[in-house]
Amino acid sequence: DEAIFNDIQAYNDENHYQKPYTIKEVNGRQIAIIGQAFPYTPIANPARLVPNLTFGIREQELQTTLDKVKVKHKPDLVVVLSHNGIDVDKKLASRVNGIDIILGGHTHDAVPNVIEVKNNSGVTLVANSGCNGKFVSMMDIKFSGKSYTYKYNLIPILSSQIVPNKDMERYINKISDPYKADLSEIVGYASETLYRRSNFNGTFDDLLCDSMNNVLNTQLSLSPGFRWGATILPNQSIRMEDIYNHTAITYPNTYVREMSGETIKNILEDVADNIFNVDPYLQQGGDMVRTRGIKYSINPKQTINNRISNLRLNNDLAIKPNKMYKVSGWASVNNIEEGRPIWEIATEYLKTIERYKVDNTKNIDVIGEKDNIGIDI
């Protein structure tokens, strides 16, 4: 997720880049809406792309803003639009008083029911709508004096059943028409479902990793645990638009470098801690880094430096801490890479093999989560 602020002037009041809230009147009721940006933007993305901006989970600043809004505008309802993620939202709701509703989507988890979080001022309703326009959250509020009741529905969006808005359709066509030839080019075919969202892997990520290992001639590859990108069905053609749909970021360049076995393990441990840390405020988003060419075991309930074990190459030879291995990857956060963009690598690979078939060999052993129905590898 990237911050884009084209042609927006700095908002100077109390050092905010933009006004942190707005007031909307809905059916005669004053609704205060406060925005919460993704707190780890300069960590999960290159900090150089958001210079002079700061981000974070600032409970006291939010509480101060909320208190001022209540005094100045006396809203009937306070809503926070959040890019935090469901776990962070739940913790925030328990520690900041006066928020009625938090509507979020960062974790991309479609949560079917509202989560009621208790705090010192009462209860905050926390909802999460998923991603990619698959769902719309609808919350009906019925006021009775200063109190209210609510009804919540998570509505699935079936695009085939929706008539497009004509103005928006014309606008999209106007923007995309110059690129249609490139976007519609068929570069390969999928033998099975290519998707992104699993905790530890995704078959489209397997495609990207296999592309790097083959085109860049590396032993193993790393791909970020991004959560976005539309699924491709079995026997469906893979177009350039599909490749861009999973890779279109402003730092797409690939890299090849030698890494020690110790460095490889440290990378896996660091990413795992960002995901599985017991403190939601230390979870920085995304799913586990995707890998090809290696096998490992992971215990999410362990602490940092103790989650990853039994790290091996695909031929079952142990990865040794002091031995060097040839590694490829893309979307480097800390370095400006000079390699070709990942979409060029994936396209070259697909044009060579024509049809991509996923190797379903189990390379990741998840320990201690046998009864967790949310784990899918």
Language-model regions, residue ranges each:
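Acidic, metal/ion-coordinating pockets
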Residues: D1-S159, N199-S211, I275, K357, ...
